[in-house]
Each structure stands twice: as C-alpha cells, then as structure tokens.
C-alpha cells in the first residue's frame, strides 16, 4: 500500500469590529509527504489483465494476478511532497453591510507550497526495476482576489436574494 502523512495546523478567526463590517481570516499550514518506500506496482493491460514477459522471446502474455511471473515495478517515494493541493493557504476577507439587506465583500486567498500532481504509467516505470521518485515541481506562490455582493429583499411576500460574484478579479 501507499501511505501518506498529512499533518498541519489550521487557524480561523472572525471579528465584527462594528455592526456594519465583518472581518475573517484563515491560515492553514500543512506538511503532506508520502510515507512509503518499496511500493510494488503490478503491470496490467488496458483490459485489466495481469501481464508477464517470456524471458526467451521478450513477448508479453497474460498471467494470473500476483503470480510469480506477474511483472512489477518498485517505487520509492518516502519523504516526497504530496502534489495537487497547496500545503500553505492564507485568506483574509472583509464584508460590509452599508444598509439593510445589502452586503458587499472581498477576500484574498494566498496559495503556497503547492506541488505539481503526478501519476504513474507504463511510460515512466521500468518493469522489474526500482524507481526513486523525485520531488515534484513546486508551483510558484499565487493568490486570488474574489468579490461578492448580495441584496436580500421581499417580493410578493416571498424572500428573495439577488447575488453576484467575481472570482479571480485580478485574473492571476
């Protein structure tokens, strides 16, 4: 099996310094690393059938899963960062309520220590060999500014809300 260790701390705070304003902040600090070495990956064809190779002819043939001749590769990945999600995230937001029913706000989110997602296939594994996984590419630090507004009102005795969002306002 492949194991990963996900450790970290998360903090979140919300304040209302005045009746008409809310401020929120969040910080998430993580350490996500693969915790496995000598992981065995078996070879299968596109139909999910276990593969073996005849040593004399080098021809591939179908075998039983887990049989002695079932082809495999070994992957060492202990201590390598898990990719696909920022391991440090921070957020600061503010919402204003200038009059009854109306809200307008913005929030900025910072993403750091984000590593590229990766996967394995037959093109990057050598059957019968050991592959030592290298650290994935660290994506540059990035941020995103989002804005939102909403107006809550009644129409014909029913509650209604008109709202809009602009995600990634700065197009970064």
Regions found by a protein language model. Give the residues of each.
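Gram-negative outer-membrane beta-barrel transporters
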Residues: 1-120
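Outer-membrane beta-barrel domain signature
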Residues: 79-81, 135-138
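Aromatic-anchored helix/helix-loop segment that forms the rim or "lid"
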Residues: 131-132, 138, 142
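Residue-level signal for pocket-adjacent positions within structured domains
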Residues: 75-77, 132, 164, 170
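Solvent-exposed, glycine/polar-rich loop segments of beta-barrel outer-membrane systems
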Residues: 46-47, 125-132
């Amino acid at each position: 099996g492949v194991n990963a260790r996900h450790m970290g701390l998360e903090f979140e705070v919300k304040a209302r310094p005045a009746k008409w304003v809310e401020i929120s902040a969040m910080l998430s600090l993580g350490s996500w690393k693969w915790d496995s070495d000598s992981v065995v990956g078996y070879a299968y064809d596109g139909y999910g059938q276990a593969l073996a190779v005849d040593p004399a002819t080098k021809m591939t043939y179908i075998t039983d899963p887990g049989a002695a001749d079932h082809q495999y590769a070994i992957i060492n990945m202990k201590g390598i960062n898990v990719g696909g999600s920022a391991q440090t995230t921070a957020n600061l937001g503010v919402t204003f309520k200038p009059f009854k029913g109306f809200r307008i706000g913005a929030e900025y989110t910072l993403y750091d220590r984000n590593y590229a997602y990766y996967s394995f296939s037959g093109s990057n594994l050598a059957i019968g060999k050991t592959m030592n996984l290298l650290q994935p590419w660290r994506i540059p630090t990035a941020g995103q500014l989002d804005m939102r507004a909403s107006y809550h009102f009644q129409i014909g005795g029913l509650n209604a809300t008109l709202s809009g969002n602009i995600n990634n306002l700065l197009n970064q």
